[in-house]
Every structure is written in structure tokens, then in C-alpha cells.
Amino acid sequence: MIASIRGVIQSIGNDYLIVETGGIGFLIYAPRSTLSAAGAVGSDIFLHTILIVREDALTLYGFSDNAQRSLFEQLIGVSGVGPKLALSLLSSGTPDEVRSMIAGGDVARLARVPGIGKKTAERIVLELRGKIDFRQLAASGSTSVSALDRELSEILVSLGYSAAEAAAAIASLPSDAPPTLEERLRLALRYFGSA
């Protein structure tokens, strides 16, 4: 398996880039966020990768961080979701946003991603919802979970929401959300349509 690659960008396409290392150019498919952060042709790049082996092809998929790669691995583990579909889903938002959609059971938003219909979106939620939790949502971000958000999560769980639903509601809070527990609770309940 090729777990990572470091090299020089030779070309950038709509859904791939070519990275040359050791005199070999590797075609690597990547989500939009990775492509937009890649830099210009001729610049150095480091990607976390997954090599998918099929009977007729060896295909590399590259990611800017481990959170994207981990989510990609979870997505391709879902029945009916292949690498291209998982890449399309990762291109629709950050790993936290995608996890929030799954944890919150937001089938409508998932189904709006190109290539994902309602049935596939439902299958993704069904198979991954219990595997996405608050710790995973928080761990993939660069900031730690505040004591306020931990308390908010406990309140939401005591109101009958699952830990995954609470995590999705908290992850959906805007970055400039008020620092008071009451206001954050109001915004979190609005996420569920309860406020």
C-alpha cells in the first residue's frame, strides 16, 4: 500500500493531480479541497494516500490530512459507495461537515451531492451513523472541544438526542456562536427544528 507521497506537482485537473517523485509521475485523484490547497504546478506537495486495487486498475487517492483519508475509508466501506462517489461526497464539504450530515441523519443534504441518490444517502446514514461520534467530530478539527460544548452535548443527550445527533448539532454551530450555554443550546435546538 502507498500511504503517502511527497513530490512536485506536474499537473492539476478537475479531480486529480499528477505528482512526480523519483522520476515517476503518479496520477492521484483528490477532493476539491485538497486540489485547491495544492498550490501551483511546480510546487512541492505531501499527500496522505490510499491505493485502491481493482482487477483492471491500480488507483491512487490523495488527501491533505488524515481526517479526509479516514472518512474516505469509512465511506468506501458502505455497500454501494465506491471511491469516486466517496470522493464526490468529500468534495461537498469538510470532513466535519460530511460527518455532521451523517451523524445528524441529513439524508436530503447527502442526496444533493452529485451521484448520490436518496437510497444511497439513506444507506450511508444507516451504516455510518453509529460509527460517527462526538469525539471523532472534534478530533478531526484543529480545535479541542470546549467544556461548554461538552456540557451542551450532555444537555442534548439528556433531552433524548443520541450522542451522534448532539455532535452533529454542535458541529453545525457557527464559529461566531455566542459563548453562553443558553444561546448555544437555542442554536443547537434550532438545528433539530425544535426551537
Curated annotation (Swiss-Prot):
Please provide the record's free-text comment about the domains of this protein.
Has three domains with a flexible linker between the domains II and III and assumes an 'L' shape. Domain III is highly mobile and contacts RuvB.
Q: Where is this region: Domain II?
A: 65-139
Record's keyword terms, sorted: Cytoplasm, DNA damage, DNA recombination, DNA repair, DNA-binding
What is the protein's given name? Answer: Holliday junction branch migration complex subunit RuvA
Q: Where is this region: Flexible linker?
A: 139-143
- Describe its assembly: Homotetramer. Forms an RuvA(8)-RuvB(12)-Holliday junction (HJ) complex. HJ DNA is sandwiched between 2 RuvA tetramers; dsDNA enters through RuvA and exits via RuvB. An RuvB hexamer assembles on each DNA strand where it exits the tetramer. Each RuvB hexamer is contacted by two RuvA subunits (via domain III) on 2 adjacent RuvB subunits; this complex drives branch migration. In the full resolvosome a probable DNA-RuvA(4)-RuvB(12)-RuvC(2) complex forms which resolves the HJ.
Question: What are the GO cellular component annotations?
Answer: cytoplasm; Holliday junction helicase complex; Holliday junction resolvase complex
Q: Which InterPro entries match?
A: DNA_helicase_Holl-junc_RuvA_I (IPR013849), Hlx-hairpin-Hlx_DNA-bd_motif (IPR003583), NA-bd_OB-fold (IPR012340), RuvA (IPR000085), RuvA_2-like (IPR010994), RuvA_C (IPR011114), RuvA_C_sf (IPR036267)
The text of the family note is: Belongs to the RuvA family.
Region of interest (Domain I), residue spans: 1-64
Q: Which domain of life is it from?
A: Bacteria
Q: Name one GO molecular function term.
A: ATP binding
Specify whether Iron is a keyword of the entry. Answer: no
Task: Cite the residue spans of the region called Domain III.
Answer: 144-195
Which Pfam families does the record associate with it?
A: HHH_5 (PF14520), RuvA_C (PF07499), RuvA_N (PF01330)
